[in-house]
Curated annotation (Swiss-Prot):
It comes from Rickettsia canadensis (strain McKiel). One of its GO terms (biological process) is leucyl-tRNA aminoacylation. It catalyses: tRNA(Leu) + L-leucine + ATP = L-leucyl-tRNA(Leu) + AMP + diphosphate. Belongs to the class-I aminoacyl-tRNA synthetase family. This is Leucine--tRNA ligase. It is found in: Cytoplasm.
Length: 834
């Protein structure tokens, strides 16, 4: 099998089979899988992702489209830097070696990529254009620098965006995240929050789950800001944001973020307050905040209620109010907010009900809508009515204003690492921040660099960061931070349109190819990569790099590949190939000791539940692996790896070869007529095409297996419909080609076809062949089913009437009389009224 696969891979390579032109009169189709990080080896998760995309690409090609199906490398990132530290090798050397290896692996799987368009994000000829783009953003005030409280990963020694912190830990290292103040570069994605939110409804070919995740991440909140005067210091105010301003008369405290500026100005920092603030520093984002026990500490500060000066509210530093949401301050209404209620119970604060409820709000918060009570001029109004009225009132009295807030924050792009795209800025003592001139791009990374695992090597480089200021020519310092690697993946799909363009994009090529028709990848990228790519596309549109404002028309998120986990008697993880199964028990191959089988989980290095793809490929071949990852589960669902399932796919491929040998030996003079087989061939063509279009690839494979069984069952018959068997087998080979391209090309050639299979059109079905010669009708008497009968297509209404009224099961109800009436539902029901 491997020889056949290598043969066809070489032919496709020699013929440049999947290279496409930007100048073509065919309709275009752009299918793209999320580009991989070049770790050195592709894994089964890659194979599943890319096999899905490959089926779509090959199918659309057979449907007559000009198909762009490119591949590239998201090559910057921490693993390369860690490998450099471990192996004393430059990250570039490690990365390019991995790229070469993985490119060969992808080719060995038979994926139909246009390798002439390959991009590598660590290539200066790629990233110089994103440096230029960053400078353009800076000129438009869409890129800026500020000191910010950031998520610091103490293992990777770098800053992480909020989206990269999962349950308080770094998404790569797993380290507990710390909070630090650092000068950082940001992109103003918040300027596009409203458009990013509004356009979600138009992404009709995206999964609802992803659209919902983006909506929640952007998190639009409409409410009001109130101005609370500080008691005994009425020149000072605390501005408070609330999404439920109508509950203002239920306020019992003001909650502020631990880093609210008023703490430094007006609040005495007692040791207790300092300790509390330190504890708050460990809460890294909204996801961890939701899980944390709500806590707070009283300050010496009090404020005056904006509508009732007799009400004095304490100011409490809390662990659940964030400075980067709203104003960093809230009014607490414990009766109608779960977080406020939890804190009020803990700190013995008043709980004042202002919405009618059928529960005791002292025991549990009532968070539903209702009628306002205990609320002065708002009494008797619904929540929405009260909300509008209170906003009008605070604006009239100038004690507040209507306000819209977003959960989405500006994107912090600074990373304190070496192996990334250098940020093209210079710091001069005379001129302050100075952009690198366009003519000096790209700013490249040095080759002579030392890695010791401590901080950013660019900070310690003896010469690289030292440069003369482009404005005054005096000594200056380069920015030593590099871009977040999501920067590279936020625009790469535009570069594929012409990867050799002499600007960021070739706009004419982008106008032809964009948007991407189908983008395929994991749902874990829903609120990072996909959101950033949408943001970049909008800005690139404004910079005249592209004409579209949304990058991906359709999105498909595939499930993960799972495998059982194993542990030895010492609780150490074991690889699957270290384990053998006997009598429904698992044993260590070497020691013979009993092994515990754990849960079936996502394949991961840490739990060793991986399979060696190269070994499997040598044993079973690429086609069998492709078929298995597509046939055993719907593509959007998780797939459990199974050697027995893989062996079944290998047997099916062997069966195809056997079927070819039988069919090749058949003589055309041995013939019969099998209308049912002919009908099944045409039905299979119809439904396989529909299944592929709907990504029901496992269902398509099941239909093709059914057709193969129907064809092979003819082999044992004395009188065989040879013509239909041969036609059906030719169709089967064509239908299977997008799934198992190597063996189908081989069989197609052996069948005597001159044209390459990948160049042929997808088979067409004949609608007239889908109909049966007969049909079954339900026979009712007075609306109740009494019998069924199979009629010929040619049967007239008169014949149907005569046959049905003479059926024995009908006759006993007629009792020798004529029916009063006969009602027909054509080809479905005949109802005899007696």
């Amino acid at each position: 099998m491997n020889q056949i696969e290598q043969k066809w891979q070489q032919i496709w390579d020699d013929e440049k089979a999947f290279e496409v032109s930007n100048e073509c009169n065919k309709p275009k189709y752009y299918v793209l899988e999320m580009l991989p990080y070049p770790s050195g080896k592709i894994h089964v998760g890659h194979v599943r992702n890319y096999s899905i995309g490959d089926v779509i690409a090959r199918f659309m090609n057979m449907q007559g489209f000009n198909v762009l199906h490119p591949m590239g490398w998201d090559a910057f990132g921490l693993p390369a830097e860690n490998a450099a530290i471990k192996n004393n090798v430059h990250p570039k050397e490690w990365t390019y070696s991995n790229v070469d290896n993985m490119q060969q692996q992808l080719k060995s799987m038979g994926f139909a990529y246009d390798w002439s368009r390959v991009i590598n994000s660590c290539d200066p000829q790629y990233y110089k254009y994103e440096q230029k783009f960053f400078l353009e953003l800076y000129e438009r005030n869409l890129a800026y620098q500020k000191e910010a409280l950031v998520n610091w990963d103490p293992v990777d020694n770098t800053v992480l965006a909020n989206e990269q912190v999962v349950d308080g830990r770094g998404w790569r290292s797993g380290a507990i995240i710390e909070k630090r103040y650092l000068k950082q570069w940001f992109l103003k994605i918040t300027d596009y929050a409203e458009e990013l939110l509004n356009e979600i409804k138009n992404l009709k070919e995206w999964p609802e789950a992803v659209r919902s995740m983006q909506e929640k991440w952007i998190g639009k909140s409409i409410g009001a800001n109130f101005y609370f005067k500080v008691k005994d210091n009425e020149d000072a105010i605390i501005e408070v944001f609330s999404t439920k301003p109508e509950t203002i008369f239920g306020a019992s405290f003001i909650g502020i973020a631990f880093n609210h500026p008023i703490i430094e100005k007006l609040i005495s920092k007692t040791p207790e307050i300092s300790n509390f603030i330190t504890k708050c520093l460990h809460i890294t984002g909204s996801s961890e905040l939701e899980k944390a026990e709500k806590d707070g500490i009283l300050t010496s500060l009090y404020v005056i209620h904006p509508f009732d000066p007799s009400i004095i509210l304490p100011v409490i530093i809390t662990n659940f109010v964030l400075m980067d949401y709203g104003t960093g301050a809230i009014f607490g209404c414990p009766a109608h907010d779960e977080r406020d209620h939890e804190l009020a119970v803990k700190m013995n604060l008043p709980i004042k009900q202002v919405i009618e409820a059928d529960i005791d709000v002292h025991k549990i918060a009532y968070t539903e809508d209702g009628i306002l009570i205990n609320s002065d001029f708002l009494n008797g109004l619904t929540n929405n009515e009260a909300k509008q009225k209170v906003i009008k009132e605070i604006e009239k009295l100038q004690i507040g204003k209507r306000s819209i807030n977003y959960r989405l924050k500006d994107w912090g792009i600074s990373r304190q690492r070496f192996w990334g795209c250098p940020i093209p800025m210079i710091y001069c003592k005379v001129c302050d921040i100075v952009p690198v001139p366009y003519k000096d791009l790209p700013v490249t990374l040095p080759d002579n660099v030392k890695f010791n695992g401590h901080g950013n090597p660019l900070d310690h480089h003896p010469t690289w960061k030292h440069v003369n200021c482009p404005k005054c020519d005096k000594p200056a310092i380069r920015e030593t931070d590099t871009f977040d690697t999501f920067f590279e993946s936020s625009w790469y799909f535009t570069r594929y349109c012409n990867s050799h363009a002499t600007d960021m994009t070739d706009k004419k090529a982008c106008d032809y190819w964009l948007p991407v028709d189908k983008y395929i990848g994991g749902i874990e990228h829903a609120v990072m990569h996909l959101l950033y790519a949408r943001f970049f596309t909008k800005v690139m549109n404004e910079q005249n790099y592209v004409s579209v404002r949304e990058p991906f028309k359709g999105l498909f998120t595939q499930g993960m590949v799972l495998h059982a986990t194993y542990k030895d008697e010492h609780n150490n993880w074991l690889y699957p190939d270290e384990v053998v199964k006997k009598d429904n028990k698992f044993f260590h191959k070497k020691s013979g000791n009993l092994v515990v089988q754990g849960r079936i989980e996502k394949m991961s290095k840490s739990k060793k539940n991986l399979i060696d793809l190269e070994t499997m490929q040598k044993q079973y071949g690429a086609d069998a692996i492709r078929l298995f990852v597509l046939s055993d589960s719907p593509p959007e669902k998780d797939l459990e790896w199974s050697v027995s399932g893989l062996e079944g796919c290998s047997r099916f491929i062997n069966k195809l070869e056997h079927m070819f040998k039988v069919i090749a030996s058949l003589k055309d003079d041995v013939t019969g007529i099998n209308k049912e087989l002919n009908r099944l061939v045409h039905l299979t063509i119809k439904y396989v095409a529909e299944d592929i279009k709907h990504f029901a690839l496992n269902r398509a494979i099941a239909r093709m297996r059914e057709l193969s069984n129907a064809i092979s069952s003819e082999f044992s018959k004395e009188v065989m419909d040879v013509k239909t068997v041969k036609y059906g087998f030719n169709v089967l080979v064509q239908l299977l080609n997008p799934f198992i391209p190597h063996i189908t090309e081989e069989i197609w050639q052996k069948l005597g076809n001159k044209e390459r299979l990948y160049k042929t059109a997808f088979p067409a079905f004949d609608e007239s062949m889908l109909e049966l010669d007969t049909y079954v009708m339900a026979v009712q008497v007075n609306g109740k089913l009494r019998d069924t009968y199979e009629f010929n297509n040619s049967a007239s209404d008169y014949e149907i009437k005569q046959i049905t009224i003479n059926l024995p099961k009908v006759q006993k109800f007629l009792e020798g009389t004529e029916p009063k009436k006969i009602i027909f539902v054509p080809r479905k029901i005949v109802n005899i009224i007696v």
